[in-house]
Amino acid sequence: MLLDEIEAAPRERLHLPWPRDRRLARLAQVLADDPADNRPLEALAARAGLATRTAQRLFREETGLGFAQWRQQLRLIHALERLSAGQPVAQVADALGYATPGNFIAMFKRAFGTTPGRYLRAPQAGGDAAVA
């Protein structure tokens, strides 16, 4: 039921702009497949055949977000899916590559203005929170 509420939330709030450039899309897919991948953009860009500066520029042009913002948005979407499926916060934090649950909770609170636990207990979970 909670997943239904999250899915019913306005799409733009949970929307992740996907890059059109095939090299950048390949890089984005690597992170979507493994959101815990903490490699820096330099390493990911090189693997996709892009210079770091080109990857930075393309991310901004094609998604409207910087790379770090895009990665955080990706992780927030994965976090909401996992939390709504009942996974414990510590497990979600680990699955998303955070060193500690506290680091994950701090990021979540910056984005949604509340902790994951309070967010999930809210009557309209997912309905009123916008990703910052």
List PLM regions with ranges.
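A short, Lys/Arg-enriched amphipathic alpha-helix from helix-turn-helix/homeodomain DNA-binding modules
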Residues: 3-39, 45-48, 65, 69-88
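Terminal helix-turn-helix DNA-binding modules in bacterial transcription factors
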Residues: 38, 42, 61-101, 105, ...
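Recognition helix of helix-turn-helix DNA-binding domains
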Residues: 49-52, 56
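Ser/Thr-centric signal marking residues that sit
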Residues: 54, 63, 115
